[in-house]
């Protein structure tokens, strides 16, 4: 269902100058919550941006009626520290410092340099590039340095 929602709202969000990072539908305390997270290629995602996007996509979602039950729409920034789960997440996080855990239990910190549909390239501290297929990644999360 979230894939259909993503397909419906992605073009609208891009027409406003922002990028759709993720869509998730969760249930918390018996309440359905549709979470839409954004990236602003020109800077931070402000509260005004979240409100603007929410006001535009809310009626669109109501008309499409993808979600049968009542739900709350939450629009937010993709966040400073987040887990990268899809090739799209990797592509939208290029240049960021990440912590990588591999399925073989190896782990390292690096800068995400490139990503495609099959693998991601990481620049290690010694500036060497390590290419890893997604199937070999256990967990990758962005790191925010204060």
Swiss-Prot record:
Listed under GO cellular component are: cytosol
Listed GO biological process terms: ribosomal small subunit assembly; translation
Q: Which SUPFAM superfamilies match?
A: YhbC-like, N-terminal domain (SSF75420)
Q: What is its main location?
A: cytoplasm
- Subcellular location(s) of the protein: Cytoplasm
Q: Which domain of life is it from?
A: Bacteria
Cite the entry's keywords alphabetically: Cytoplasm, Ribosome biogenesis
User: In which family does this protein belong, per the annotation?
Assistant: Belongs to the RimP family.
PANTHER family found in the cross-reference section: RIBOSOME MATURATION FACTOR RIMP (PTHR33867:SF1)
Briefly state the protein's biological role. Required for maturation of 30S ribosomal subunits.
Supply the name of the protein.
Ribosome maturation factor RimP
- Which species is this record about? Helicobacter pylori (strain G27)
Annotated gene: rimP
């Amino acid at each position: 269902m979230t894939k259909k929602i993503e397909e419906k709202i992605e073009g609208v969000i891009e027409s406003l100058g922002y990028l759709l990072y993720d869509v998730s539908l969760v249930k918390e305390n018996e309440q359905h919550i549709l979470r839409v997270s954004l990236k602003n290629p020109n800077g931070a995602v402000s509260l005004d941006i979240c409100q603007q996007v929410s006001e535009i996509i809310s009626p669109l979602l109501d008309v499409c009626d993808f979600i049968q039950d009542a739900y709350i729409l939450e629009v937010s920034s993709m966040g400073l520290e987040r887990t990268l789960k899809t090739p799209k997440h990797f592509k939208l996080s290029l240049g960021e410092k990440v912590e990588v855990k591999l399925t073989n239990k190896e782990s390292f910190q690096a800068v995400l340099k490139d990503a495609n549909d099959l693998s991601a390239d990481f620049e290690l501290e010694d500036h060497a590039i390590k290419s890893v297929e997604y199937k070999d990644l256990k967990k990758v999360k962005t790191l925010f340095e204060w």
